[in-house]
Amino acid sequence: QHVIANSSEQEFDYPKGEENVYISYPGKGGVEISNFWRKFLFGWKFDGTSLLLSGYPTKESRVMFHRNIRERVGTLAPFLKLDNDPYIVLAENKLYWIVDAYTASEDFPYSQRFRASQITRQRGDFDPVFSRHKLSYLEGSNYIRNSVKAVVDAFNGSVDLYVFDPEDPLLKAWSSVFPGLFKPREQMPDALEKHIRYPADLLLTQGLVYSKYHMTDPGVFYNQEDLWIRATEKYYGQVQPVEPYYIMWEPPDAQNAEFVLILPFTPKNRQV
C-alpha cells in the first residue's frame, strides 16, 4: 500500500500536555510528486483520480511504495531468495532492517533436493504446519548459500546489498550481470555488522538434511539406523517440534558469552 508523505496535512506525532505535536516527513524517501504529470501518473497507477483531485499533495510531497521489507528487496533483486524473518536493529542512532538473502539452485550435480514435507513425513517428525518458518521458498533447492545481507534504512528506504560469500559462483554471475548492485562486506559499517546473525531458516534447512546425512558409515546409512528427528516440547498442552532459537551461551573456557542459534535433535523413536 502506498502512502503520501509531506503533504499539506500534518501527521500526529505525540501528545504534549493539553496539545498535540504534529510533524511532516523530513526525509528523502519515496519519489517526489513535483509536477502535474507525476501526480497524474501516480494517481493512474495507485488510486485512479483520488490523488489527482486531492488538494493534500504539494510539490514537496513524496509517494512511497514497495514499503514491505521483503517486497522492496525482492523488487531490486528478484533472483535472490529472501528469509522470512527480517529483523530491525539500531545502529549509529538510526533504525535498519536486515534481511538474509540466499542464492539457490535446483540443478547442483549429485545433490539431493530439499523437500521439507517429505523429510518430516518419512521420519515421523510431525509438524502439521511445518513450523512458523515456512521453508516453502527453499523447497526443491539442492544448493543454498546465505551469500547476501540486505540492509534497508527504515527512515528513507534505501537498500544496500552486502556480499558475505564472495566465492559463491551464482552470486559472481549475478554481480557481473548487474555491476554496482552489490557491495563488499568490508563496506558494511561496523555498527551494522555487529548485528549480523546466523539465519534460523538456514539452520532449520541444514538441520533437516543433516539429520540423515550425518551418517558416514555406508551400512548404517543404507539401513537408516541412526536417523534424527527434531526434539519436541510441550507448548500450551500441545506437543510440537522445537523451533531454532537464539540464546546467550558461554562455551567452556571462554572469556565471554556468545550469541548462538540452537536446534536440538534426538534419535528417531527414542525421544521422550
Provide a role label for each language-model segment.
Residues 1-272:
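Soluble extracytoplasmic regions of secretory-pathway and membrane proteins
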